[in-house]
Each structure stands twice: as C-alpha cells, then as structure tokens.
Amino acid sequence: MYSDKTLMLNNGVEVPRIQLGTWLINNDDVRKVIRQAINVGYRAFDTAKDYGNESGVGKGIWNSDVERSDIFLTTKLPTSIKDYEGTKKAIDDALDRFNLEYIDMLLIHSPQPWIEVNRINDRHFEGNLENWRWKKHLKPVKLDQLVFQIFYKKT
C-alpha cells in the first residue's frame, strides 16, 4: 500500500518517503509498471540513466491520468560525469529521454565512477563540486533538487 508521508529537506522541499524503484525493469515493461503503480496510488518514482528505462518511465507518467505536478520523479547523474558541462548535458539528455519538462530530484549516484569504487583512491572531490555548482545555473522548471547519494567515509 502506498504511503503519502513525506520527509522535509533542509530547504523546505517535501520528498515522498516511499518511491517505486525501477532498477532491473526493462524500458518496455516499465511504462506499464508506472501506470499500474499510479493507479494504486504511487506518486514517486526512482530511476537512472544506467537503468536504461528513463524513456519508459516518462511514457508511463506522461500517459497517466495524474497531473505531472502530483508526481515526484528522481533520477541519477551517471557516475562517470564529474564536470560542469557533463552535468548540464546529462540533465538535458535525461529530460529528452523522459519527454518531460522537469525532474524533481537528481542524485549524484556515486562519488566515484563504478569501475573505481574501492579500487582507486581518487575521491573526485573537485568533479563532484562541479556537479553541485551547476545547480545554481538551473532554471527552476528543470530540476528542483540536486542531492549526493552513496557518499561514505572510507574506514
């Protein structure tokens, strides 16, 4: 059963506590999954470019009977992107794949590219800051939130 409970971020934005994750759902099937989830009350969805299903997620949202403003959409910046221009292009490309006007939350999926995790000591601090700096140039209609995900202290 869907919960409409939210968490309040420091900036006042409310994020749904439960989002339907779309990892491992192929692009053709995810459209139907999104529509069925909306029909039972889900209003928040999580995807990523690496999942290969952003287009289907967008179609599922676009073809539903629910207003876009009532849906909370999260996607992720590919782990290999660690620069200002790459971030801009990734957001524009994601919007094209979704065929939607904005993304509610963009997560920086990992501080390191996947192939480097736990192997290379470069933590990409400058690159991640470049991802973050790009947010100040976003128009509000493109993206509400830019958040770091899977950042941890190495022990």
Feature roles, as predicted:
Residues 54-55, 81-83, 115-116:
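Short active-site-adjacent helix-start/loop capping segments
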Residues 63-66, 82, 96-100:
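Short, charge-rich binding segments
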Residues 87-155:
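Glycine/proline-rich, positively charged
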